[in-house]
């Protein structure tokens, strides 16, 4: 079983190799992660990943912004270079979820909801997105076929990555006939529970 640290280390090592730089030139590391604490019992990822990569005593920070965590890490890495704090910074995004049950993962993801408003009424993200789709359809006439076209477009883009979690194209029938998660959302309209990293 690959740990959240091992996933991050592999992605970062490959990125450093791909960039063609000596890792000793990296002056900062930012890691974007949302649920390593509740799902893996592991926090303080910045320092641990920096150590695993052998980067020495450099500033290392974990940032969290739910689904935007990796993007936030990338932004901070760019800003540290733009500000002249370092010539090279690395951003890593990582999540490990599949070792936990759907209920445990859902509860962890729900921590991104505002507990004082959304959480009190029992919302989940698929539930909120299902409601948002209904509202969008009411105002703009959004159809099932239009949403399926977006799913297919995203799937096509994902298949360009040989490491993609789901390595096959979906037909419109696959999408429409997948099980209901939160009406009108079906399985393939939703993000899968996954393990992965990028850098």
What is each PLM-predicted segment?
Residues 36-88, 92, 96-128, 166-192:
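Conserved catalytic cysteine-centered active-site region
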Residues 23-33, 59-65, 89-94, 145-152:
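Beta-strand segments within the central parallel beta-sheet cores of soluble alpha/beta enzyme folds
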Residues 2-9, 25, 30, 36-37, ...:
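Metallocofactor- and cofactor-centric catalytic cores in central/energy metabolism, strongly enriched
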Residues 13-27, 136-141:
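Phosphate/pyrophosphate-binding loops at sites that engage ATP/ADP/AMP, CoA/4′-phosphopantetheine
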Residues 5-20, 45, 49, 73, ...:
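Short, well-ordered amphipathic alpha-helical segments that serve as non-catalytic structural scaffolds
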Residues 1-5, 14, 115, 139, ...:
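Condensing-enzyme catalytic core mediating Claisen C-C bond formation in acyl metabolism
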Residues 122-171:
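N-terminal leader/propeptide and maturation segments of large enzyme subunits in energy/redox metabolism
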């Amino acid at each position: 079983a690959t740990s959240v640290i091992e996933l991050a280390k592999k992605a970062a090592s490959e990125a450093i190799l791909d960039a063609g730089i000596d890792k000793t030139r990296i002056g900062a590391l930012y890691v974007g992660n949302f649920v390593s604490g509740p799902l893996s019992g592991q926090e303080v990822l910045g320092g641990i990943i920096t150590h695993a990569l052998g980067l020495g005593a450099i500033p290392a920070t974990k940032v969290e912004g739910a689904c935007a965590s990796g993007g936030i890490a990338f932004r901070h890495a760019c800003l540290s270079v733009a500000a002249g704090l370092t010539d090279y910074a690395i951003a890593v995004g990582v999540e490990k979820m599949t070792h936990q049950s759907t209920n445990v993962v859902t509860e962890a993801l729900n921590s991104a909801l505002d507990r004082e408003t959304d959480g009190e009424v029992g919302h989940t993200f698929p539930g909120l997105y299902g409601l948002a789709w209904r509202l969008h359809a009411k105002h703009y006439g959004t159809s099932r076929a239009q949403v399926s076209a977006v799913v297919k477009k995203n799937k096509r883009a994902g298949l360009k990555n040989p490491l993609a979690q789901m390595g096959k194209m979906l037909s419109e029938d696959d999408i429409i006939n997948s099980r209901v998660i939160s009406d009108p959302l079906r399985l393939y309209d939703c993000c899968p529970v996954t393990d992965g990293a990028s850098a």
